[in-house]
């Protein structure tokens, strides 16, 4: 099975790129780290009091994510889909069977960490580095529509999340991968994809 990790700050286009890749391949599946936030009372309380909670590792349910990741990797199938509800702070589970999986795409703000802990075999890593203002516009539109935030709150949360994303890797040495690509606004995506699948 081919593993692809896609990382980048909020609003950089990770989900869009993942869907574009899925459209070009057969038997692929996307695991979004956005659907693996912790739930329950403690998580609800922390989300109120910890600044940038959803951008920090303490919010990520790594155990549940790893369980699903390993199941797909070991069996080549997925039997359920998870979707995190940001307003209710719950994970909805849906039965959705996918068989003969040949490509597993992990995308989200925690994908970089996941690639270093779960990518113990050959994998490709794509990091999106997109203009900050462009990312902020996308996040505001999404948060107004899907997450019930005011424009001011969406702006403030984005600026904090941007800083958190880049600060958490500032002093960490992350092993370089031979199949690592940096995606900017000027990148020819089709060329990158052709290298991924050659």
Question: Language-model segments: which ranges?
Answer:
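The conserved Walker
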Residues: 10
């Amino acid at each position: 099975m081919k593993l692809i990790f896609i990382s980048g700050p909020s609003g950089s286009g990770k989900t869009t790129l993942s869907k574009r890749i899925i459209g070009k391949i057969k038997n692929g599946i996307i695991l979004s780290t956005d659907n693996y936030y912790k739930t329950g009372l403690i998580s609800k309380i922390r989300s109120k009091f910890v600044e940038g909670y959803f951008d920090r590792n303490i919010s990520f349910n790594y155990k549940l994510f790893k369980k699903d990741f390993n199941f797909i990797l070991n069996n080549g199938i997925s039997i359920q889909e998870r979707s995190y509800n940001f307003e209710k702070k719950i994970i909805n589970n849906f039965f959705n069977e996918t068989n003969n999986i040949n490509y597993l795409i992990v995308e989200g703000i925690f994908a970089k960490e996941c690639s270093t802990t779960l990518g113990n075999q050959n994998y490709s890593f794509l990091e999106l580095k997109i203009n900050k203002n462009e990312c902020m516009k996308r996040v505001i539109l999404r948060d107004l529509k899907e997450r019930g935030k005011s424009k001011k709150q969406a702006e403030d949360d984005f600026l904090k999340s941007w800083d958190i994303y880049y600060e958490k890797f500032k002093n960490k040495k992350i092993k370089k991968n031979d199949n690592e690509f940096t995606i900017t606004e000027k990148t020819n995506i089709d060329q990158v994809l052709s290298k991924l699948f050659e």
